[in-house]
Structure formats: structure tokens, C-alpha cells
Amino acid sequence: MKNYKKTYFDYTTKDFVSMVQEPGGKKLGNCLYCYKPLTESGVDFHTACNKRFFGQLYTPTLDYSFDDLEALASKVVSSHMAVTGVQPKLSLSLHRKQDKNRVKKLTIVGLYGDYILKPPTAHYKELPEVEDATLHMADVCGIAAVPHSLVKLTDGTRCYITKRIDRTRNGKLGMEDMCQLAERLTEDKYKGSHEQVAKLVLKYSSNPLFDVTNFWEQVLLSYFTGNADMHLKNFSLVENAMGTYSLSPAYDLVNTALVNPADT
């Protein structure tokens, strides 16, 4: 982890949002992926950032409004095809059966998509920006994190989007969170400890010393960014191409001190 000149982050939620938004709440002037200034008008991503995150030169369309997502999310949950977790999530995939010259669409597909979309909620309207900014801090610190970005709906609402790391062109990869490895029920995810997670990493990882070091870096980052929600399901071992398991990149990092100051 890189050295910090400051060891304490004293940010407000508005500070986090301002990292990806121009003053006054006007049109985004920075790339939703890398946060650097855009060089073209009418776009939300650099061409290189589109290629890096979506695998194509243009931003795929996401033809849903916030109200559309709320209605669709209810249908997905009732059909038992929702992505697991407390925060509302929708599974997306690029619609590839289109004319090669047309911009591809991101569509909701149930469980087996390539991306996970997290819209804001009524109680935590700026949660997508906070989660993406927290993971961006991991990137800046040199800590491996899942591919992530912000993306806009048709009504301008920003959502958090991440690329699934347990999916490849060849199929699904195994991914076991620490709740599963500790043989605990999901409702017991808060009944563990970082010491227990470290021991599980040492026991099951194919590269234990390297991975346990990376694990403690994630713990330190969580402390510095005010993240009080790193339970057993927020650390996982993921299968690689050789069939062995290693610590997954950081995911579900949220500055809970900003989102819910009472939970600190």
C-alpha cells in the first residue's frame, strides 16, 4: 500500500460526490470511470476507458430510468433471480446480437450477467458515488479492486456498476466468500473477525502469504476510509484459470461513516 501524507480522511458525502461532479451539480465534466477531465462534450467516458471497462470504443446504452429499475428490481426479486446482498442489485449483460455498427445495449438478464448494477436507494441517494469513490481510493493506493465505474440512467441518475470477476468467456469461476469457508449462515456474517478471515486465507489460498498481506491491506484501507461494514461475505477466494484459489480483489467497499454516521 502506498504511503499517505495524511492518515485520516475527513470527508463529507458532498466531498465524495464532488470528486466526480463539477461544482453546482451541473453536467459531469469528468470521466465516470477514471475521474479525469473529459476532452469531448456529450460523453461520459474517455474512449480508452470505454475499451478498458466495456471492451468496446463506445459507451453501451442503458435504456432505463430510476423508476424503471425500481419496477424491474421488484420483478427480479420476486422471481428469485436477484444477485445476493442487502443493497439492491441487478445483473446486466451486453446485448451482443446486434448490428456490429450499432452501439450495444446493457440489458437486465437475471443471475448470469457480466456486470452488477447498484442503483441509489431512497435512504442513501449518494451511495453509488461513495462506493465508487472508495474503490477508486483502493486503485490509487495500489490495492487490487474489482473493475468498477459509475454509469448514468436515461434520467441522469448515477448508478454504481462493477464487472463480475467470477465470469469469463469460457464460463463461471468458483468464488467462495469467508462466510461459506467458515461454514456460517449468511445471517451470521457479522459474527466473525479479521483474525478468522486471515486464518481462512492462510488455510485455503494457493498463495497464502501473499494473499494474507493483501487482506490486511484491505483491512487498513477500510479503517482509513471509514468502512465499518467489512463482514465475512465481503472477503472471498476466487478461482483462477489454473483451477487454484486466491484472495479476490477488493469489492463492496463503502465509506459507511459518510453514508450512515450513526454506524461508526
Model-identified regions with their sequence ranges:
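Conserved NTP-binding catalytic cores of kinases and kinase-like/nucleotidyltransferase enzymes
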Residues: 1-122
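Conserved ATP-binding subdomain of kinase catalytic cores across diverse folds
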Residues: 66-189
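Acidic surface patches and DE-rich sequence motifs
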Residues: 10, 153-154, 240
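Short beta-alpha connecting loops at secondary-structure transitions
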Residues: 262-264
